[in-house]
Amino acid sequence: MWITQLLGIRSGPPLGSHAWILIAIFQLAMDFIICESESPGKAYKHLQRPSLVRRVHKVALWSPTELLKLRNQKQFWNPINNEHPVLPIERKHYKTYHENLFFSRNVPLKYSTMKNSHYSSQQIKHTVKTTNLNRSKRQLQSRSWDNLKRFLDSGSQPTTVSEFILWGPTGDDDVESSTFPGIYETTRTSTVHARTTLLETTTTTTASTTTNVKVTTLQNPGIHNGKKSPGRISTTDPNPGNGKTARPPRIPNDTSGLAVHQIITITVSLIMVIAALITTLVLKNCCAQSGNARRNSHQRKINQQEESCQNLTDFTPASVPSNMDIFTAYNETLHCSHECIRTPVPVYTDEALHQTGAFKTTFNGNRPTSSDRHLIPVAFVSEKWFEISC
């Protein structure tokens, strides 16, 4: 009833026209019941199956790996195929196996995942690893034998193998005391056995033997060819000079010593400095001597002036008589010792005395006689005049 009410169906004649709606609802309900009764894995596969047709154009059809992936996807999504599906782990193993297939040829093809094998990935990896280790050991043995055989065939010319470095003393000691004792074990084997080993491993060491290491021949005087070790290789440098200390090699661009022009420049500079010092001392002594001479001459001249003019102020009362005139007394006593005053004596005449009236008014003393008029009036002249004249 609730379905008919929901759909708006009324009771009556129109009921026959809506019968197909009821049938569709019933079919939908049955589909839900069937889906719930089935397992969830199968239902999920039915509902979530991707469309492979749309992704085919993205896959490179000429690549075998892409074709194999597409085939595995088809097998995984096939609901009819009830066999064991190829899991992602097996696909990862397939990738690892094919990557290692280029380096190892001893792994049989029965381990391929194309036949749905039951081998685990760990077992396959272990097998591949073991095969690679065996192959590397065989390559090392064959390569060491080739190098040592070439060294033994060289005879007197010593060779230095760049692949091996042997450290230790350079005497005739045992070969087994070296760092690599296993290398010389191959030399004790016979040549026939070594050649058979090479013939057995030609399929695995073809690429490695074609690219052999180059052997450089060097004339090294430090190698000793002993009886126990005919192929002794020495990497130590010999001691040159028979015990004498060798002089280190000189660097081409080494300028540790002084050049000739530098020595000349330093010498000239020292000579100029010494000459400047000597010149300074000589000039200083000359200036000191000239200063002393000038000072002494000046002092001597001052002393002479003082001695010559000392009598000008030396007036004694006994030298002037009481009954004589002052002009006469001064005229007799005032004179210089070196006779520096020899000036013409002015003559005072009557005309010269009567020219001005001021002189007559100021001079009221007794006029001297005509015989005494040639005297110099010393009383009216300062003492400085005599110093200047002297």
Curated annotation (Swiss-Prot):
The segments annotated as topological domain Cytoplasmic are 284-390
Q: InterPro entries from the xrefs? A: AJAP1, AJAP1_PANP_C
* Signal peptide stretch: 1-37
Its annotated compartments are: Basolateral cell membrane; Apical cell membrane; Cell junction, Adherens junction
Q: Where are the transmembrane segments?
A: 263-283
Question: Per the record, what is one GO cellular component?
Answer: basolateral plasma membrane
Q: How does it sit in the membrane?
A: Single-pass type I membrane protein
State its role.
May play a role in cell adhesion and cell migration.
Supply the name of the protein.
Answer: Adherens junction-associated protein 1
Q: Which organism is it from?
A: Xenopus tropicalis
Source gene?
Answer: ajap1
